[in-house]
């Protein structure tokens, strides 16, 4: 059984606000929103796979997942997560026999992988204006990803060429 999750960020943020540190209060909320957005996507992808036999639900999960990535500008905010989303959706469309949508997602994956997303680093944007400092202060690797960039690029390529998932 899973316990009900209650985010601690609103309470912590309120404490900082009451102490007069509004910037810290904002930073805590931004970090929480960022983390929950990534966590939500990490929940939606396996749920999508489990619901692949229900056409309507499967399509709705895909639609909502892609909407979240667009709303939060993951193409620039966290492209490595967006690559995972595109790949997962493509694979699920492939398993369902939908060649057109498979190719559409693989095209998006390839375009993003070949775009100017490198070097891949965790960072904020115009919405997450206080995230950069939070990442540096709270993550052991700061804004660095846990893998070397050469390994990441190789994995991105191998996802299409060596996995056999689309064979």
Where would I find each of the regions flagged by the language model?
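Generic helix N-cap/helix-start motif at coil->alpha-helix transitions
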Residues: 2-11, 35-46, 78-86
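Short coil loop/turn residues that delineate tetratricopeptide repeat
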Residues: 2-4, 31, 38-39, 71-74, ...
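Residue-level signature for tetratricopeptide repeat
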Residues: 14-15, 48-50, 92
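Structural signature of tandem alpha-helical TPR/SEL1-like repeats
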Residues: 22-24
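Conserved structural position within tetratricopeptide repeats
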Residues: 33-34, 111
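Alpha-helical protein-protein interaction modules
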Residues: 43-45, 54-166
């Amino acid at each position: 059984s899973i316990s009900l999750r209650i985010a601690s960020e609103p309470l912590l943020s309120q404490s900082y606000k009451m102490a007069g540190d509004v910037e810290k209060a904002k930073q805590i909320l931004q970090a929480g929103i960022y983390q929950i957005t990534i966590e939500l996507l990490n929940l939606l992808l396996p749920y999508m796979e489990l619901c692949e036999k229900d056409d309507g639900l499967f399509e709705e999960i895909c639609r909502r997942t892609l909407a979240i990535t667009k709303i939060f500008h993951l193409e620039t905010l966290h492209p490595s997560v967006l690559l995972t989303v595109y790949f997962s959706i493509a694979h699920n469309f492939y398993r369902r026999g939908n060649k057109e949508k498979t190719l559409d997602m693989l095209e998006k994956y390839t375009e993003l992988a070949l775009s100017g997303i490198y070097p891949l680093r965790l960072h904020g944007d115009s919405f997450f204006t206080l995230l950069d400092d939070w990442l540096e202060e709270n993550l052991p690797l700061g804004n660095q990803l846990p893998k070397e960039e050469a390994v990441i690029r190789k994995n991105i390529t191998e996802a299409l060429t060596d996995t056999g998932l689309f064979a």
